[in-house]
Amino acid sequence: MKMILKTMVCLAVAFSGTAGAANYSPEKSQASLALKVPGNPAVEYPLTLSKLSDSYFDYEWKAKEKIPVTIFQQISTVDDKQQVTVVLTAMEDVYFNFEERIRTDFRHDDCQFYLPGFWYRRNLRSPKEAPSFHTSDSWVVREDRLSTPLTGIFDEKQKKYMTVVRRAEYIQDALSTHKEGEVILSGTTSLGFTGFENLDGTAALAFGFPYKEAPKTYIRKLTLAPSVTAFQLLKKGESISLTWEIHEGKGEDFAEFVSHTWEYCYDTFQPKPVETDYTPDYTKEILSHFFIESFVGDRPLNYNSGVHMRTDDCQNTGSAEVGFVGRVLLNAFNAWEYGWKNNRADLKENAAKVFDTYLVNGFSPAGFFKEFVDYRTGYEETVFSIRRQSEGIYAIFHYLDFEKRNGRKHPEWEAKVRKMLDVFLQLQNPEGSFPRKFKDDLSIVDKSGGSTPSATLPLVMGYKYFKDKRYLESAKRTAEYLEKELISKSDYFSSTLDANCEDKEASLYAATATYYLALVSQGKEREHYTGLTKKAAYFALSWYYLWDVPFAPGQMLGDIGLKTRGWGNVSVENNHIDVFIFEFASILNWLSKEYSEPRFSQFAEVISTSMRQLLPYEGHLCGVAKCGYYPEVVQHTNWDYGKNGKGYYLSLIHI
């Protein structure tokens, strides 16, 4: 008796803005089947599609040689979509890998490419050590790298696009003994592969099962390795049914293509909030343990230690960092606010020490924050970043506003912040951007403008707090730069401290910056900023998972039941997920009301609930040594930051 394995795949074609479904074109399809006998190189069989009559199936894929596998294909129309179901049946035990390609009508050189959360345009902002056109113009990758298991190709000249998305029950994965070359899986996986190829100058969608990565596999930051092809056992008499979906549409530009595709993917996967027993109040109570146990109070700068911390002991380190990973001042404000609201004298006392020591010892001669100090080595960063400085001011404004609303004032802090904002005005370039890095004498170290939106936030906050229109005008100039160089070009890059690649935080920061400006604007100006926020938000959303990747038994994240929907990929170069969200959920709820778009608020709820899953408390420490220490680097795919790999955290924890 045949066993139909529940790994379903079909192809569906739909047109955006056009009536009726597209016709499946067999002449545009290519396929191959690779079979491997253990201990021997795999043999690849090119396949030819033959039309059938008087059969349940419409087509059969055939090889020139006799092979121990039958491959049938059925085409059906559902609503405005065309579905193609491929069924493989083994005549004897085989280890197989199936691949199909569909040619578009697009010249490869005219196209931009999109694999959500991993590949944007041609990834040319990344170096050749990461996946990009620098290495090849054809790439296929395993599906769990992607926030949606989809590949999209956008023809800029024809203003058309085509996507392929996997439709399957992603319920399992299997371990392999190695990560490159031909690998036989230890069990059954749900993971296939997807990507794009240049077929004689024509762009083609490529996809298959089980997973494959070519021409290289990406194993850790800036480290490419030889390609990998996985082979899964299909026993004699067993069948496997596979399903993909092809979607076609039109878009004025790459941004419209991405926004249409995100909406299509959202409607396809329909992610639901993740059910946990953790209320917001309980979550905050658990997280407050970090504020107590991580406090370091015997240094010139007091701080909560969360940078470069080991997950197996969570011992405090010597690193005090104002923004970026450390967020010392924002942690202090969160502890301060929570302490007042919950009558926690211990939290208030520690937070006050952080603010007091930074006020006295935390500034450079020119008035910048000492943004990174390592007390173990004595190292102090002398090259400043607009991001860390901005995030420090952002935190202090939250503190000052809270204090003012509760009848307390801090004129010394106000003077410090005002001085920093005045120096910001000197740093700003004529076109509105801010340099990414600079020295205390304002000499420029890195002129890249990708981090500019991080400065918009404190400038708007400074305008609201001090009623100083100079700061608002400066913030508006940043928006002019963002619109011209990032948002209009759909090119969100280098928001981090050193990498230049496309990353989630660049679009998230751009959306937050224009959101802040919309809140302090009226009329046409407000409408304009709101539109920019929406555009940037779609790109930020594209990084967040709409589906749950499978894990193999023994991989900790899978064993504790992690659902990846709602978590965000980090960047083109760093293929892990994290909890970076900050105000983005509030922005999505705001946009939902502004545009009567329920998807935004619904997904904000998915994000908010999903972020609670790895809350570490006694009996549910999730691989972390201490209660309340929530990890950042969560390795969900076949990539690692140098240790552990899929299903685990990096051995270091960033709070």
Residue ranges with predicted function:
Residues P273-P280, Y338-A352, Y399-R418, V460-K476, ...:
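Structural helix-adjacent loops and short alpha-helical linkers that scaffold large soluble proteins
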Residues I653-I655:
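Conserved small/polar residues in nucleotide/adenosyl-binding loops
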Residues R376-E380, H398-K469, R477, K484, ...:
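Active-site lining segments of carbohydrate-active enzymes
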Residues Q30, V37-N40, P46, K51-S53, ...:
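Low-complexity, Ser/Thr/Pro/Gly-enriched N-terminal "stalk/linker" regions
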Residues Y24-P26, N40, Y56-E65, T70-K236:
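Beta-strand/loop-rich accessory regions of lumenal/periplasmic or secreted enzymes
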Residues E321-G339, D374-L421, S448-L459, C501-A518, ...:
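Aromatic-rich carbohydrate-recognition surfaces in CAZymes
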Residues L287-A320, V360-E381, F424-I444, E483-C501, ...:
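Glycine- and aromatic-rich loop/turn segments at beta-sheet edges
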Residues K2-C10:
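Sec-dependent signal peptide recognition
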